[in-house]
Amino acid sequence: MSRRSRRSSSGSRRSRNGGGTPWGAIAKVAGGGAFLAALGVTFFLVNQKAEATDPTTWCNRAGPAEVHLILLDASDPLDGVQAETARAKVVSAIRAAPENARVDIFLADRGDGSLGEPIFSKCNPGVPTALDAAISDVEKKKRDYEQGYLAAVDETMAKVLQVEPAKTSPIIESLRSAATRSFSRLAGDVPVRITLISDMVQNSPMLKQSKGIGDFATFKKSAGWSSSLVDLHHARISIVYVTRANYRDVQNNGHINWWSQYFDEMNGTLLESEAI
């Protein structure tokens, strides 16, 4: 009887040790499953972001988060120092653009103020994460974006160094054309920035400032006023003010104030003007 009792006790121990629940193994499986699930969700979200992005503009298909219009007046050439300063300011402005902000660069080089296609028009794809680099082309887009706008800016500056002085300088007409192309169909709540690189001396049949600024109230009553109207979409405006020796009697605070009044009337706000 004593021996049977010992065998029974031994069998019981084997049952407890060998047939118990393998909690460590279950925890490992559960942890691995959670990791794979999280990875799957991340892949899904990144791929969803890629599918929601326009492959041509790199903007979200729902629209850009912001638009920055850069208009460079090429009716007269810039000197080397002005061109380099303007280039630095444009590059700085583009680099400051937030993710999904579209940058449009136009060159105003036509006598009637009409514009061709933008030299550059892309959205900032944002800063790629480590996972983006592994499973998507965000890093490549970021590199192409920077190389693209730098090439566009360099191309633009090369052109304005070589242009011949034009007979007209239709700044208002060029701005209207650029604004229409860039953001006329934009949702009302999307912010807009405008950077103008110009001497701002309007010279066209609409208005001639080369001999003097004139009173803004007088311009509002003129025949050219109706042709100057444009909705600037609550834009925040910066002027890179290109100074010229032949316009010393025109380019002054009164001239900048004239443009500030014009922008106010067109639903925009002049934030700053810096002479170069």
Task: Give the predicted meaning of each segment.
Residues 1-23:
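N-terminal Lys/Arg-rich, disordered targeting/topogenic segments
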Residues 19-69, 75-82:
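Acidic, polar low-complexity linker/tail segments
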Residues 63-189, 194:
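Von Willebrand factor
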Residues 64-77, 154-161, 238-243:
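Acidic/histidine-rich, surface-exposed loop or edge segments in extracytoplasmic proteins
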Residues 72-74, 178, 191-205:
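DG-centered beta-turn motif at the end of beta-strands
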Residues 85-92, 176, 217-225:
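N-terminal post-signal-peptidase region of extra-cytosolic proteins
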Residues 215-276:
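Von Willebrand factor type A / integrin I
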